[in-house]
Amino acid sequence: MSTPLTLDNARRPDGTRVLSVVGEIDMSNSGELAAAVEAELAQTGGSVLLDLTRVEYLDSAGLYVLLLHAERIEILATPLIAPVLVLSGLPELTAVHGLE
């Protein structure tokens, strides 16, 4: 059974593509996240901002998706998932905002 995950995309006035993620990211839905990130990246020649401020849980399958695309994404996080992102080394590979 897949864990519920909501993905919404938008474009900011400055042209930045934003993919907002709501729910829990785990093995059951990480493929859905990967497909959404890849679709957003295909729409832009630049990077995509992943808004993870409403993510309540992130496991290693979700981290894998983030690490796989680290060169072309930026992440907006919250203190809830910040420790996982820091331990994975992700802030050394891409911009991660909201680690405070």
Where are these regions (language model features)?
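Amphipathic alpha-helical interaction surfaces in cytosolic regulatory modules
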Residues: 27-94
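Intrinsically disordered, low-complexity regions
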Residues: 16, 24, 46-47, 99
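STAS-typified acidic loop motif
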Residues: 1-35
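Short, charged, intrinsically disordered terminal tails
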Residues: 2-6, 86-100
